[in-house]
């Protein structure tokens, strides 16, 4: 086994006491704004965890494409592993980890598809090459070679030389509506700050609890 126990870690203190926050969405918005200003790459990247029919978890990085008090939105294809797993078990967990700030946010809850209008509106904002790629990619299916993929891209590009590219029928978005948040901030000597928010329904009040690190 490769021993990593001697890796040195540094801690950056927050300005102010985030543990006084009473509402998780406002706290997330404040932390995310700081991450956008501080994180060198992809502050909107989040780990998405789902589970298959046997309960075996899957996790992968995706990009958050929007959030509000209704939830957190991402896009993919219904034929992908995440799409299939969410169809069978529409619950998921997210993790944001901002190394530059020594912070992370975990949340989990039920998942629902966004409306076709929402998906169409977002797809229309994507670069044309990305739109064509969505048509060419049979996401998560076996691929013979990179060359075969490039041929599929060229074939789709030829179809849409002129005009807009419509959204593929299997390409959609999902919204995770949090039932639980946890905000974590690194502190020296592993004496971290952890604050949890829970609610029993989307319109229920939040209950806040401080957790041991």
Swiss-Prot record:
Q: Which UniProt keywords apply?
A: Flavoprotein, FMN, Oxidoreductase, Pyridoxine biosynthesis
Query: Is Flavoprotein a UniProt keyword of this protein?
Result: yes
- Write out the pathway annotation from the protein's UniProt entry: Cofactor metabolism; pyridoxal 5'-phosphate salvage; pyridoxal 5'-phosphate from pyridoxamine 5'-phosphate: step 1/1; Cofactor metabolism; pyridoxal 5'-phosphate salvage; pyridoxal 5'-phosphate from pyridoxine 5'-phosphate: step 1/1
Residues recorded as binding substrate, renumbered to this chain, are: 65, 122, 126, 190-192
**Nucleus listed as a keyword:** no
Question: Which amino acid positions bind FMN, per UniProt?
Answer: 60-65, 75-76, 82, 104, 139-140, 184, 194
Example GO molecular function term? FMN binding
Q: Which SUPFAM superfamilies match?
A: FMN-binding split barrel
Task: Name a biological process GO annotation.
Answer: pyridoxine biosynthetic process
What is the reaction catalyzed? Answer: pyridoxamine 5'-phosphate + O2 + H2O = pyridoxal 5'-phosphate + H2O2 + NH4(+); pyridoxine 5'-phosphate + O2 = pyridoxal 5'-phosphate + H2O2
Q: Which InterPro entries match?
A: Pyridox_Oxase, Pyridox_Oxase_CS, Pyridox_Oxase_N, Pyridoxamine_oxidase_dimer_C, Split_barrel_FMN-bd
The annotation note on the cofactor reads:
Binds 1 FMN per subunit.
Q: What is its EC number?
A: 1.4.3.5
Which cofactors are reported in the record for this sequence? FMN
- Enzyme class, broadest EC rank: oxidoreductase
Instruction: State the family it belongs to.
Output: Belongs to the pyridoxamine 5'-phosphate oxidase family.
NCBIfam families reported for this sequence = pdxH (TIGR00558), PRK05679.1 (NF004231)
Q: Oligomeric state and partners? A: Homodimer.
Q: What does this protein do?
A: Catalyzes the oxidation of either pyridoxine 5'-phosphate (PNP) or pyridoxamine 5'-phosphate (PMP) into pyridoxal 5'-phosphate (PLP).
Under what name is this protein listed? Pyridoxine/pyridoxamine 5'-phosphate oxidase
The upper taxonomy is: Bacteria, Pseudomonadati, Pseudomonadota, Alphaproteobacteria, Hyphomicrobiales
